[in-house]
Curated annotation (Swiss-Prot):
Manner of cofactor binding, per the entry note: May bind 1 zinc ion per subunit.
Protein name: Protein translocase subunit SecA
Organism: Ralstonia nicotianae (strain ATCC BAA-1114 / GMI1000)
Record keyword Cell inner membrane present: yes
HAMAP family, sorted: SecA
Cofactor(s) demanded: Zn(2+)
């Protein structure tokens, strides 16, 4: 109440910010006549003048009014478009490192030019991040005219580009590209073997278009670069025959033993997207595996040596019960292609990790591709937080404002519209069954079609879009279908979705980034005419004029019919996605309307609100085909959506907390790697490694502050001679001396070590040997880092079980991953020193050949793939941590001893004795820990 009163008196935070920005708008507008009077050459010279002023110490904030006024004037001359005042506000919000929420059709692309131009003056690079290559290329070409006119260079970073083209794109003042490509380039830059092979500059400033889609929807899963691992394809085929032999349990068993409607062998938890074997299912699966010869007599499926079987069985169960054809994926030729759940687009080249993709391939009977080993990985949260300044724009960010602030430190500012919105959002209509719902949708579409009103129908899956298309064909209503299967025609279909009587079916937000103009997009059509080389210039001009006249007539006709009508056939689990669909209508003050048609069969209602709504319908004795249209039901659905959004936020937050641990380690490894790459001679670094290795070795035989009787000098001599090629007569030295300190012996060892090292360098020369050392360090660091990533994956997958031991899984993960990281650094240090000391090289040519071979072995990774999964094991861990289920995980959490990472990499689990330390890393004996479960 008090908060509301204060808002009335002082205005909300958003209103106060807008008021501050409006004061600057007045300054910019006051400069307009001055810049209008300048010639083209004088206006273009302003960019260099701004750069000189910036170099002398003037800030970008001080340059803002003039720079915005110059950009606006240049846009009027080059683009024939003048920035509205609200677009100037949007530009200032972006420059301040905030998120600008601008309604669809308010000109986000043009708004961004202001902040991009101002920040490009600094010469440190500006990245404009889009959701796909098409938009990156379109915006770079479209806005590139303006930037080039102002003397700025523009690059576009595409997936298909060659290495030198990418370097040129990043060297430009402004670089357009997709979120995935920027992230993958960062990872690839940290895998190169020569500093000149890098493409990115330090990350300075990024503007993320459709920021909600990139930083929230796609942030649940990491970017992964992977290479081929061990072949388990036959095991996937054999496991695929098991799920059909098991029956699904209906209902989840509660603590009091109730809740199970129909007993079965496994239970599917749709909320957490997981499958769990019941006790009966566990026994049945063991019997099947025993008969198949995959499990030995008397062995448990949960025994450590059978973890691989467990992993494959769960992958197969999930493939059969949670992932459905034409909803989560499509089959094209001999390939399973993932469908993006948010856009409905096909994600070519992407694969689910953790064996899930192979399990789906086995289910569909297509060729099973080998599993991959992670070579490098990062989450979008941690990639984008590396930019010195980050900003974003979208039509729908306000519902996620808290998350943007909490995770990225980004404030959301809602920008006022240039014209008052005219769209009417009608009440949801809820039907008992899907059939009744679709009947109502067809009636609504027919009504609009007969009145000449264009309709955009939103569906949540390819399956539903094809079902609706079938129903419209039966009803003899012409229409266009826009889903992942029609990706190539996407922009063309969306551009014409505003023509009279046009009915367009779209999965979710496919076609985002292309405006739906009432009467159709005349610019697109004119573009096709201008690109037709068979026409003369006169004919092109005549046809374009004719198109513009026709468009004006169609535009007025559609406005009179009520503008674009949006039909939602199902609520998405996020209110933001629903708002995006609604936002396609009523752009720039145009008329428009929207309505959602729901049924109690919808997944969202079934899981979260179905019983409550069904009870209301039964109480009201609703006849068949009659919808319920009430605020209480809509509020009930929004409450369900808020629950899902809250849960997804928790998953992303937990994902980030886990990845922050790996991120700290990633930063240290990449920093060390960059030091090696940039150093002309890494001799000092090698010396530090060498000294610490031999001090540690010496102390293993001669403990600090120990008595002479405790020294094992003969053993130390033998180890130095046999393992390191270093001869030191330690026993003789002690025998000849009346008394000697251990520090004197250490000095003697170090001098002998340095003498051997100096001899190796002298053989081939310092310059050649430095190159060899650099190659060895990079090879060792990269190999051990990959093994470390595999070990972290395994640790992460089972860590939530620590909750049962009253331990905080996140703290346990931090502790154990830190121990693993310590081992990683020890392994690198020991391996580098050992290779340098044991290498037998007679000539400079041999040394150079060895260096080249090392780099070639590492750079020629087989089957390298770039993945950004829809839902990965990382997100599952976060979900498991938030809502623990009493099942044993499919993979061991962690293995003690130096062989753990290598074993994890090969997918092998060593047999564990009852009195050995438990593989989970708890520190307990196996029989007292996970041995109980076996």
């Amino acid at each position: 109440m008090i908060t509301g009163l204060l808002k009335k008196i002082f205005g909300s935070r958003n209103e106060r910010l807008i008021k501050q920005y409006r004061r600057k708008v007045v300054q910019i507008n006051a400069l307009e006549p001055t810049f209008e009077a300048l010639s083209d050459a004088e206006l273009q010279a302003k960019t260099q003048a701004f750069r000189e002023r910036f170099a002398k110490g003037e800030t970008l904030d001080a340059l803002l009014p003039e720079a915005f006024a110059v950009c606006r004037e240049a846009s009027k001359r080059v683009m024939k478009m003048r920035h509205f005042d609200v677009q100037l506000i949007g530009g200032m919000v972006l420059h301040d490192g905030k998120i600008a929420e601008m309604r669809t059709g308010e000109g986000k692309t043009l708004t961004a030019t202001l902040a991009v131009y101002l920040n490009a003056i600094a010469g440190l690079g500006v990245h404009v991040v889009t959701v796909n290559d098409y938009l990156a290329q379109r915006d770079a070409e479209w806005m590139g005219k303006l930037y080039n006119w102002l003397g700025l260079s523009v690059g576009v970073n595409l997936t298909t580009m060659a290495h030198d083209e990418k370097q040129a794109a990043y060297a430009a003042d402004i670089t357009y590209g997709t979120n995935n490509e920027f992230g993958f380039d960062y990872l690839r830059d940290n895998m190169v073997y020569d500093d000149s092979q890098r493409v990115q500059r330090p990350l300075n400033y990024a503007i993320v278009d459709e920021v909600d889609s990139i930083l929230i929807d796609e942030a649940r899963t990491p970017l992964i670069i992977s290479g081929q691992a061990e072949d388990h394809t036959d095991l996937y085929r054999r496991m695929n025959s098991i799920p059909p032999l098991l029956t699904r349990q209906i209902g989840e068993e509660k603590a009091d033993g109730t809740g199970v409607e129909k007993p079965g062998d496994y239970y599917v938890d749709e909320k957490s997207h997981q499958v769990y074997l019941t006790e009966a299912g566990h026994e049945k699966a063991e019997q099947i595996l025993l008969q198949a010869g995959l499990l030995a007599e008397g062995e448990s499926l949960y025994a450590p040596q059978n973890i691989t079987l467990m992993h494959h069985l769960y992958a197969s169960l999930r493939a059969h019960s949670l992932f459905h054809r034409d909803q989560h994926y499509v089959v094209q030729g001999d390939e399973v292609i993932i469908v993006d759940e948010f856009t409905g687009r096909l994600m070519q080249g992407r694969r689910w990790s953790d064996g899930l993709h192979q399990a789906v391939e086995a289910k569909e009977g297509v060729q099973i591709q080998q599993e991959n080993q992670t070579l490098a990985t990062i989450t979008f949260q941690n990639y984008f937080r590396m930019y010195a300044k980050l900003a974003g724009m979208t039509g729908t960010a306000d519902t996620e404002a808290y998350e943007f602030q909490e995770i990225y430190g980004l404030e959301t500012v809602v920008i006022p519209t240039n014209r008052q919105a005219q769209r009417k959002d009608l009440q949801d209509q809820i039907y008992k069954t899907s059939k009744e719902r679709y009947d109502a949708v067809i009636r609504d579409i027919r009504d609009c079609f007969e009145r000449g009103q264009p309709v955009l129908v939103g569906t949540t899956s390819i399956e539903n879009s094809e079902l609706l298309s079938h129903l419209l064909n039966q009803a003899q209503l012409p229409h266009q279908v826009l889903n992942a299967k029609q990706h190539a025609r996407e922009a063309e279909i969306v551009a014409q979705a505003g023509r009279p009587k046009m009915v367009t079916i779209a999965t979710n937000m496919a076609g985002r980034g292309t405006d739906i103009v009432l009467g159709g997009n005349v610019e697109k059509q004119a573009g096709f005419v201008m690109a037709d080389e068979s026409l003369s210039d006169e004919e092109k001009a005549r046809r374009v004029t004719q198109l513009q006249d026709e468009w004006q007539s169609l535009h007025e006709q559609v406005k009179a019919a009520g503008g674009l009508h949006i039909v939602g056939t199902e609520r998405h689990e996020s209110r933001r996605i629903d708002n995006q669909l609604r936002g396609r209508a009523g752009r720039q003050g145009d008329p428009g309307s929207s309505r959602f048609y729901l049924s109690l069969d919808d997944q969202l209602l079934r899981i979260f609100a179905g019983d409550r709504v069904r009870a209301i319908m039964d109480r009201l004795k609703m006849p068949e085909g009659e919808p319920i249209e009430a605020g209480i039901v809509t509020r009930s659905i929004e409450s369900a959506q808020r629950k899902v959004e809250g849960r997804n936020f928790d998953i992303r937050k937990q994902l980030l907390q886990y990845d922050d641990v790996a991120n700290d380690q990633r930063r240290e490894i990449y920093k060390l790697r960059n030091e090696i790459l940039e150093a002309v001679d890494a001799g000092d670094l090698v010396k530090n490694l060498r000294e610490s290795v031999f001090v540690e070795l010496f102390r293993a035989y001669v403990p600090a502050e120990s008595m002479e009787e405790q020294w094992d000098l003969a053993g130390l001599e033998k180890t130095l001679r046999d393992d390191w090629g270093v001869e030191v007569p330690l026993v003789k030295t002690v025998e000849q001396a009346q008394s000697i300190e251990d520090e004197e012996l250490l000095t003697q060892v170090q001098e002998a070590v340095e003498a051997v090292y100096a001899g190796k360098v002298a053989q081939v020369g310092r310059e050649s040997f430095a190159g060899f050392e650099r190659s060895v360090m990079l090879q060792s660091l990269d190999t051990h880092w990959r093994e470390h990533l595999a070990a972290l994956d395994h640790l992460r997958q089972g860590i939530h079980l620590r909750g049962y031991a009253q331990k905080d899984p996140k703290q346990e993960y931090k502790r154990e991953s830190f121990e693993l990281f310590g081992r990683l650094l020890d392994n690198i240090r020991n391996e580098v020193t050992r290779i340098i000391f044991t290498v037998r090289i007679q000539s400079q040519a041999e040394l150079e050949e060895a260096s080249e071979q090392i780099e070639e072995d590492l750079s020629q990774l087989t089957n390298v793939q770039y993945k950004h999964d829809e839902f990965s094991e990382l997100a599952e861990v976060a979900a498991g941590d938030a809502e623990i289920h009493g099942e044993t995980p499919p993979v061991p959490a962690h293995r003690s001893a130096a062989a753990s990472a290598a074993a994890a990499l090969a997918g092998q689990v060593p047999k564990v004795g009852r009195n050995d330390p438990c593989p989970c890393g708890s520190g307990k004996k196996y029989k007292q820990c996970h041995g109980k479960l076996a």
